[in-house]
């Protein structure tokens, strides 16, 4: 089992998109009240007094949409300035990024992942669940701006949805050829949303829940060829290059290939729940309640340390326990991805 040194921190469960694999339109979502979110000060306290002493040094800010979090630039600056912070990154949908990219970069954000599931504005609108015009164009502007201000390499996350955007695999992979962009293809994972896209004829026709990474790789391999890359990130992606490309293509295969032995992370939800595994809901700790009840940082740290010792069992032996019935208590937007 890898050393666990990477914490994904969800800052907010709200989003300005309604991506169908994350928070589908029409679903009843109980948003966290603002007073139930971990505060700026509570987050910094947990990092300084609990996680960093336990060896965590890599932090990723997620959501919901993290750029909706009030004071996001100040929070980035405070986390980046912690002496133990080796890497600080963010996953965003990019819609608000054009006006914030420069400030985030100057505040100390090292890396950024931007969700881009389609190059077709109409398909993009379908996936994000919005009818408002120019959503794709604004997102694309955010991507270009982030690259221009210094986020180089830039990572683009693509959730491949059968019958919806799988016909764009080659076009999206091609983005890695001329710029130092890392394209990450992610297997569709219907956590908390068992009816995802069930009303779309394309999905019914496709007759499958996800497109396996090997199938995606083969499409790219047949067009250009693929070679293994010596660039490795902090996550579970298997990374390759199109020969001669400036960037890379990576594959995150949480549905078709078990990578529990490479897991190096935990997840902290916006309301303070620490989750050791994405695929099940065993062993979670309510850190916010402990903190607000006056429990000492030492005591909280001991509880997290114990969770770290049992994490391998949770990853391996209980890997599928969160979906025995096909139902998760939380959607991806609430977990933080």
From Swiss-Prot:
GO BP annotations, alphabetical order: Mo-molybdopterin cofactor biosynthetic process
Alphabetical list of InterPro entries matching this protein: Aldolase_TIM, Elp3/MiaA/NifB-like_rSAM, MoaA, MoaA_NifB_PqqE_Fe-S-bd_CS, MoaA_twitch, MoCo_biosynth_MoaA/MoaC, rSAM
Cystine crosslinks: none
Cofactors that this protein relies on: [4Fe-4S] cluster
Entry's Gene Ontology molecular function annotations: 4 iron, 4 sulfur cluster binding; cyclic pyranopterin monophosphate synthase activity; GTP 3',8'-cyclase activity; GTP binding; metal ion binding; S-adenosyl-L-methionine binding
EC code(s) of this entry: 4.1.99.22
Positions of [4Fe-4S] cluster 2 binding: 260, 263, 277
Pfam families assigned to the protein according to its UniProt record, in alphabetical order: Fer4_12, Mob_synth_C, Radical_SAM
Top-level EC class: lyase
Family: Belongs to the radical SAM superfamily. MoaA family.
Protein's UniProt name: GTP 3',8-cyclase
Native species: Crocosphaera subtropica (strain ATCC 51142 / BH68) (Cyanothece sp. (strain ATCC 51142))
């Amino acid at each position: 089992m890898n050393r666990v040194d990477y914490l994904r921190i969800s800052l907010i469960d709200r989003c300005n998109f309604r991506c169908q694999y994350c928070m589908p339109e029409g679903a009843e979502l109980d948003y966290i009240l603002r007073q139930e979110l971990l505060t700026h000060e509570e987050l910094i306290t947990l990092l300084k007094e609990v996680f960093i002493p336990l060896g965590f040094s890599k932090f990723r800010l997620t959501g919901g949409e993290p750029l909706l979090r009030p004071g996001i630039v100040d929070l980035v600056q405070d986390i980046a300035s912690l002496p133990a912070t080796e890497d600080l990154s963010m996953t965003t949908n990019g819609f608000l990024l054009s006006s914030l990219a420069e400030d985030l970069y100057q505040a100390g954000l090292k890396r950024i992942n931007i969700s881009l599931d389609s190059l077709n504005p109409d398909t993009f609108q379908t996936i994000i669940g919005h009818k408002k015009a120019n959503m794709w164009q604004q997102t694309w502007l955010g991507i270009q701006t982030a690259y221009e201000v210094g986020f180089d390499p830039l990572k683009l996350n693509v959730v491949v949805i059968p019958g919806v955007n799988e016909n764009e695999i080659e076009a999206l992979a091609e983005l890695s050829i001329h710029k130092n962009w890392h394209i990450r293809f992610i297997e569709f994972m219907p956590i908390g949303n068992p009816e995802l896209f069930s009303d779309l004829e394309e999905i019914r026709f496709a007759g499958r829940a996800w497109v396996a990474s090997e199938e995606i790789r083969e499409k790219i391999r047949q067009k250009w060829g693929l070679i293994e890359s010596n660039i490795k990130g902090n996550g579970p992606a298997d990374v390759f290059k199109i020969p001669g490309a400036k960037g890379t293509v990576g594959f995150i295969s949480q549905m078709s290939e078990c990578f529990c032995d490479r897991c190096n992370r935990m997840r902290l939800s916006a309301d303070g729940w620490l989750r050791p595994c994405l695929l099940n809901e065993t062993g979670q700790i309510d850190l916010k309640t402990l903190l607000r009840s006056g429990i000492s940082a030492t005591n909280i740290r001991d509880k997290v340390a114990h969770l770290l010792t049992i994490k391998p069992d949770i990853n391996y032996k209980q890997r599928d326990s969160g979906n025995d019935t096909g139902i998760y208590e939380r959607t991806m937007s609430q977990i933080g991805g």
